[in-house]
Amino acid sequence: MPRGNFETIASKTKMLKIPRRKPSREHLEEALEQVKAGPGKAGATNWIFAKETVLLDARLQKEPVAEVEVQAVQLGPVILLTDPAEFFCQLGLDIKAGSPFPITFPVSLANGCVGYVPTKEAFDKNGGGYETRLSSYSNLEITAGPQMVEAAVQLAKEMTPDKLSERPAAPAFNNNPWEYGNLPPQVD
């Protein structure tokens, strides 16, 4: 494709409304006790997540549902599919697999920030990690990732990729490949 010569430049947007997960009453009461006790008594990690639970509860009073903008930006045969999340890698791979474009770039943390969005599998008994803990930064419902992937792929399928331009094959190395990576360490 000649530099800067795109036949199609276009964009589409889809807004999703995704509910936030809510801590149980027992979880919130325990979190309040741990926050009051302080990190020295509750333990640093427990206190941090307890504080996050209290912050999430305050946020839920004002914003129980997150507005999530998913966007598709087409530049010829290339598409950027954006979301306002810190996606798990698998969700980006799912976007690429579902896109009809020959060159697909999943783009995270675009047009906002709704925090971590793990895969559904990360919430299973063998999953876990700080990204799956209910907090002010990771709180969308468990199906948020697949919803965003589906919206991105749908937007891509509503667009038609331009044909990739033909390029000549790279010349052969003639048995003299790049050697910089094959040098031994130098320890004078």
Which residue stretches match the model-derived regions?
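Non-catalytic substrate/cofactor recognition surfaces at enzyme active-site rims
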Residues: 1-188
